[in-house]
């Protein structure tokens, strides 16, 4: 797999100096908190050997490795870490243009763009309740059919979530393309249900 993160020579040199003062085997971790949301924040931290997870991806650089967790990885596509020096001093910069919302091309199908919005904007909010939603189809007259899962299935709040949250958000984002959002889920209340 190609490396989604560019670390400039000056930043690599800066990290190597910092890591030389850490216990042997310490590398760096690059991550995104709240990936795919407007609250996404990127960060870099030390990563001692015992903090490496089996699901991490390792990217070797000059004198150290950068570890990235699976959830952050797609949102760090095209990220650039640089160490810049100017009249004000020097600082590390991390630019991750896809952290808040990975772009789908503007000419992608309506189905792809709506699915993308559900995955990056709606599902992170539903995840707090153990729920998720997926797009089933879009009719010729612009009605998106969605299916809830996890904690949303059987939840008494699902109608409010659909009408006041998801439908409102999608109709605003896809004005002129979507006319309504409908729920195709057969809601069976159970222990998995949030409410």
Swiss-Prot record:
The keyword DNA-binding does not apply. Its cofactor is [4Fe-4S] cluster. Binds 1 [4Fe-4S] cluster per subunit. The cluster is presumably bound at the interface of two monomers. GO terms for biological process: iron-sulfur cluster assembly; protein maturation. It comes from the Bacteria. GO terms for molecular function: 4 iron, 4 sulfur cluster binding; iron ion binding. Keywords: 4Fe-4S, Iron, Iron-sulfur, Metal-binding. The keyword Iron-sulfur applies. [4Fe-4S] cluster binds at residues 152, 155. Belongs to the NfuA family. HAMAP family: Fe_S_biogen_NfuA. Involved in iron-sulfur cluster biogenesis. Binds a 4Fe-4S cluster, can transfer this cluster to apoproteins, and thereby intervenes in the maturation of Fe/S proteins. Could also act as a scaffold/chaperone for damaged Fe/S proteins. This is Fe/S biogenesis protein NfuA. The gene is nfuA.
């Amino acid at each position: 797999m190609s490396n989604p993160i560019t670390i400039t020579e000056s930043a690599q040199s800066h990290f190597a100096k910092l890591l030389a003062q850490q216990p042997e085997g310490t590398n760096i971790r690059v991550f995104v908190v709240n990936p795919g949301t407007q609250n996404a924040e990127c960060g870099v931290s030390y990563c001692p050997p015992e903090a490496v997870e089996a699901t991490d991806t390792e990217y070797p650089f000059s004198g150290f490795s950068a570890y990235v967790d699976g959830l952050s990885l797609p949102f760090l596509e095209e990220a650039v870490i640089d160490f810049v020096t100017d009249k004000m001093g020097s600082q590390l910069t991390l630019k991750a243009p896809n952290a808040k919302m990975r772009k789908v091309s503007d000419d992608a199908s309506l189905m792809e763009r709506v699915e993308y919005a559900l995955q990056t904007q709606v599902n992170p909010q539903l995840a707090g309740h153990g729920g998720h939603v997926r797009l089933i189809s879009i009719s010729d007259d612009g009605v998106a059919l969605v299916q809830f899962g996890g904690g949303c299935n059987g939840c008494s709040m699902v109608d409010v979530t659909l009408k006041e949250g998801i439908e409102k958000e999608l109709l605003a984002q896809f004005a002129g393309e979507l006319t309504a959002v409908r729920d195709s889920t057969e809601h069976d209340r159970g222990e998995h249900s949030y409410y």
